Amino acid sequence: MSKFSFNIHHQHKKARSGIIVTAHGEMRTPAFMPVGTRGTVKAMLPESVAETGADILLGNTYHLMLQPTAERIVQLGGLHKFMNWDKPILTDSGGFQVMSLSKLCKITEEGVSFSSHINGDKYMLTPERSTEIQYLLGSTITMAFDECTPYPATFEEAKTSMQLTTRWANRSRNAFVKREGYAQFGIIQGSVYEELREQSAKDLVELDFEGYAIGGLAVGEGQELMFKVLDYAPEFLPQNKPRYLMGVGKPVDIIGAVSRGIDMFDCVIPTRSGRNGQAFTKYGTVNIRNSKYADDNKPLEHDCLCPACRNYSKAYLHHLVRIGEILGSMLMTWHNLTYFQNLMSRIRAYIKLGKDFDFDS
């Protein structure tokens, strides 16, 4: 089994491209991770996701602990076997979903107590329990338990939240079972305050995580403020470890973040947009519901090799989406995931050539 490692092969200014080696194979960076919240990427077969070029998927601790439960998944051979995916899987810690989805959520030093959004059952999620669940799932990359600081937050509010995340990171690290080829990432917080981001990074770097995530962005602060934070935050992190920007997925944001030193991304945008009839293309977004596509016999993109573009016209996709056929969601999602993986491939090629990004989609 391979050791977990990050090898930077090319660098252009702050942008890096390389390979992350894991127990479940290699992943190319910069990488985009399709979101498989409940053990599936919506409207896609796992093998179809792999065909788009994805090297890694994201799963969600909160949803999987509720249904079908981590204990059931481990009895069935682990998440990889359960969902028929043999490449790396990253699982988030569940904290964000607990705080955003559950009813009567209460945050204490111990963790977060909450009621299930499904049936109202009461749970307690702590750093130790979150780490245990991710271990049971067999996650290739485990995320430390954190509090995602809401925006806007005053300096003092952000400081209190960041310090709690640091204490939880210590407990997450102590609970993590180290195995060859597996990793745990710490999550730096601090909202839009440079002083807090620097302190958070300093504290977490001392815990020697295998990689680091920048959390608490894309929560309403806007692109300008997000990029301002990314102008300095990655510089506080080790050069030789992966950097993951959580929940960011607009193409222009990915390109801007890569140019600021980010290596990994996840977002529901390509899948959710596909199910809602929106396609991403090199020429901008296409709302396939628009009546102007009803008689359009051309593909979404002429040079895209996904099944939607190879075999079907915009008129057919328009028809499927307008009448609510499942195939419409499948084809639109397949196209969008292909687009995002092609975008990452293009980004990696530009870094290898030492070229500035001259595209924004």
Swiss-Prot record:
Substrate binds at residues 92-96, 146, 189, 216. GO terms for molecular function: metal ion binding; tRNA-guanosine(34) queuine transglycosylase activity. It comes from the Bacteria. One of its GO terms (biological process) is tRNA wobble guanine modification. Zn(2+) binds at residues 304, 306, 309, 335. It catalyses: 7-aminomethyl-7-carbaguanine + guanosine(34) in tRNA = 7-aminomethyl-7-carbaguanosine(34) in tRNA + guanine. Pathway: tRNA modification; tRNA-queuosine biosynthesis. NCBIfam families: Q_tRNA_tgt, tgt_general. Homodimer. Within each dimer, one monomer is responsible for RNA recognition and catalysis, while the other monomer binds to the replacement base PreQ1. PANTHER family: QUEUINE TRNA-RIBOSYLTRANSFERASE. This is Queuine tRNA-ribosyltransferase. The lineage of its organism: Bacteria, Pseudomonadati, Pseudomonadota, Alphaproteobacteria, Rickettsiales.
